[in-house]
Amino acid sequence: MLKPSIDTLLDKVPSKYSLVILQAKRAHELEAGEKATQDFKSVKSTLRALEEIESGNVVIHPDPSAKRASVRARIEAERLAKEEEERKIKEQIAKEKEDGEKI
C-alpha cells in the first residue's frame, strides 16, 4: 500500500488531477534544488512531494494569477540583485585600475 494513501491526499486537494499536477511540480522543484519543508522517509522526489502535500506544507495556490505575479516579482528581484552585484564589481575593477595607474 502506498504511503501516504490516496485518500488522505485527496483531502488536501480538490481533485486527483490537481494532486498529480501539484505532486509533479513539487517533485521537479525538489530535483532542481528547492529547499525541502520537512524531513523525509522517502528517497524519491515524487514520494517526497506527496509527503509534503500530506503534511500540508505544499498546497495549490488559491489564486493562480497572484501566484504568477509573485513568481514574476521574485524573478525581477533576483535580476535586479544580480545587476547590482555586477555594477559593484565593475566599480571595484575601475577603482583598482585607477589606483594602479596612480602608482
From Swiss-Prot:
Keywords recorded for this protein, A-Z: DNA-directed RNA polymerase, Nucleotidyltransferase, Transcription, Transferase
GO biological process, one term: DNA-templated transcription
Record's GO cellular component terms: DNA-directed RNA polymerase complex
GO molecular function per UniProt: DNA binding; DNA-directed RNA polymerase activity
Protein purpose: Promotes RNA polymerase assembly. Latches the N- and C-terminal regions of the beta' subunit thereby facilitating its interaction with the beta and alpha subunits.
Family: Belongs to the RNA polymerase subunit omega family.
PANTHER family associated with the record: DNA-DIRECTED RNA POLYMERASE SUBUNIT OMEGA
Protein name: DNA-directed RNA polymerase subunit omega
Organism expressing this protein natively: Streptococcus agalactiae serotype V (strain ATCC BAA-611 / 2603 V/R)
Gene behind this protein: rpoZ
